[in-house]
Amino acid sequence: CASLCFALQSPRFIGTDQAFSKRGTLLQWFPEKLATIENLNNVPSAISHDVYMHCSYDIAENKHWVKKALNQVIRRHLLKGGWTDRDVTKLGEHNGKPVMVVLLEHFHSSHSIYRTHSTSMIAARERFHLIGVGNEAVDAAGQAVFDEFHLLKGDNIFSKLNELKEICEKNGAAVLYMPSIGMDLTTIFASN
């Protein structure tokens, strides 16, 4: 049942009034049920970001409740998989500035997230040593925003999260900033 709900929640485009109504009905019913799922092992977790993101297109006041439930399941999944949070009592500096690690989604020159956030991140370099972390989609313009850029190379979510944690620990990051959450699995999992 949860897999079917994931599949029905994931499309970006809902082309008929009837389909829109059905998705809205699911958004009212599903969060409470989703919150009871122990982990992501038996649901199509590869489309979790679609469930997370596309609820925003509904009109109900509580349309985002599915995010809360999904976050609860993700957190349990991470902990069951052996995840431990980073020790944030050890903060470092680089050239007298605190370190800000920025986890990116779709941060390339032709995407709106680049256009809306690159100038503020460039300005943040005055007060922070800025480290960008992202995948191959981050183009040269996106990488140039940062003092340094690290490409996430992991082949699964745990390896990507561990790589991100290593970057934060090695540099004593004072801030982990995600300018967007929901277009990619990595940011959703990192927020948990």
Where are these regions (language model features)?
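Non-catalytic membrane-proximal stalk/linker segments that position and tether the catalytic domains
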Residues: C1-V99, Q143-V145
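Short N-terminal targeting/anchoring amphipathic segment
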Residues: V102, I167-M183
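A short, glycine/small-residue-rich beta-strand->loop->alpha-helix junction that serves as a flexible
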Residues: L103-S118
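Short beta-strand/turn micro-motifs composed of small residues
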Residues: L104, G134-E136, M178
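Short acidic, S/G/P-rich loop/turn micro-motifs used as interaction or catalytic elements
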Residues: H106-S110, N156-I157, G182-L185
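N-terminal strand-loop element at the rim of the active site
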Residues: E126-S159
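Donor nucleotide-activated moiety binding/catalytic core segment of transferases
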Residues: D155-N171
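Catalytic core of nucleotide-activated saccharide and alditol-phosphate transferases
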Residues: L176, L185-T186, A190-N192
